[in-house]
Amino acid sequence: MSFRGGRGGGGGFRGGRGGGGGGGFRGGRGGDRGGGFRGGRGGFGGGGRGGYDQGPPEEVVLVGVFSHQCQDDIVCNNTSGKIPYFNAPIYFKNKEQVGKIDEIFGSPGENGFSVTLSQGVKASSFEPESQLYIDPGKLLPVDRFLPQAGGGRGRGGRGRGGDRGGRGSDRGGRGGFGRGGGGGFRGGDRGGFGGGRGGFRGGDRGGFRGGRGGDFGGRGRGDFKRSYDGGSFGGQNNKRTKFE
């Protein structure tokens, strides 16, 4: 059984790059919205691109023990009873950083993880059952990944304007606060802050910059250009030829 699933990730054990929406075990790049076990790049694990090193935490707790080497990475058994964040830093007991979590695999109750080692740390230097530590703030309770007693809240009844993304919602969709759909905060195609038709910058019809029928050279018959009537702007070439 494949743990990672494919790039489409619809219900795979880990999901894939497109996971997160199909109940995959790990989720994919889309984060933890779809019940993914791990959250992917940009998921609840944070990290990813744009992060920075905050230094060692004030406290570290045991998260797992070394199992075996896999190429340049190491594979560990999770002994914490919780689920670590993706990309969470891993330390020795003295808070020296070993690397960062790369993969999480297994079931919510029994799982392990792989660690991409920091520069200068060799996978061959680890002995069996070597203990590894983590910031306790980078662990999540297993209950978060188990089915809820009531089966969870259904999807019915949200409609347009619901709390997750109808028109005018605060999370996305058309008119969403953060995603910039139609009329969104960041601007979208129609009525957005940044442009589009009738937008703040103006667009094709009636916009701020002028369009058809505008003042400064639109396609219609505006005030700036003179029509073909022999006016002063046309010169000799614009005069009508009189035939006797």
Swiss-Prot record:
Keyword Repeat among record annotations: yes
Record region (RGG-box 1): 4-51
Region (Disordered): 1-53, 145-244
GO terms for MF: box H/ACA snoRNA binding
Chain positions covered by the region annotation RGG-box 2: 153-222
Bilayer-spanning residue ranges: none
UniProt-annotated location(s): Nucleus, Nucleolus
InterPro entries according to UniProt: Gar1/Naf1_Cbf5-bd_sf, H/ACA_rnp_Gar1/Naf1, Transl_B-barrel_sf
Pfam families, per database record: Gar1
Disulfide linkage: none
Basic and acidic residues compositional bias, start-end: 160-173, 218-228
Gly residues compositional bias, start-end: 174-201, 208-217
GO biological process: snoRNA guided rRNA pseudouridine synthesis
Comment block on domains: Arginine-glycine RGG-box regions play a role in sub-nucleolar compartmentalization. Dispensable for nucleolar accumulation. Both regions are essential for fertility and development.
Complex formation: Component of the small nucleolar ribonucleoprotein particle containing H/ACA-type snoRNAs (H/ACA snoRNPs).
Name under which the protein is recorded: Probable H/ACA ribonucleoprotein complex subunit 1-like protein
